[in-house]
Amino acid sequence: MSIATTLSLAALFAFGFTNFLWKLATPSKPYQPSYLMIQGITYIIVMSIIHIIQTHPFTTSPKLASLAVMGGICASMGSFATFLALSRGGEGSKVFPIVGLNVIIATILSIIVFHEPITIQKLIGFIFGVISIIFLTR
């Protein structure tokens, strides 16, 4: 198994657990921005520790900073919408599969922007992804 696959699986479990914690928090009706801000502060602390351990200089560029800000805005909006859906009575077993379709958007954008090849395997994956969401949300 490649390191990329291993790290992808680690991310799968970490994000899955994060989503479960969001659902776990919703019965107490938290104010979503405060919950997500605490989560964001925790993110900054963990990334700072990783940065210190790696002893790599902090570097950025205007382009990279712009991409990070746009990504932060999108992630904040997506997190807030997901959390709001859960706190408004959305079942995790329905909300998470729908939100999980975000990989299709990222894949389509990668194909368009980076000219990645469209393979039969990817097309079948898209079809199965959509079909799985239909089954999981009924």
Map each language-model feature to its residues.
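Structural signature of transmembrane alpha-helices in multi-pass secondary transporters
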Residues: 11, 99-102
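C-terminal transmembrane-helix exit sites in multi-pass transporters
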Residues: 102-122
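Membrane-embedded alpha-helical segments of multi-pass transporters/permeases
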Residues: 48-52, 111, 134
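Hydrophobic transmembrane alpha-helices of multi-pass small-molecule transport proteins
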Residues: 121-137
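Residue-level hotspots within transmembrane alpha-helices of multi-pass secondary transporters
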Residues: 20, 80, 107-108
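Transmembrane alpha-helical core residues of multi-pass small-molecule transporters
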Residues: 39-43, 102, 128
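Membrane-interface interhelical linkers
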Residues: 1-15, 24-73, 77-88, 118-120
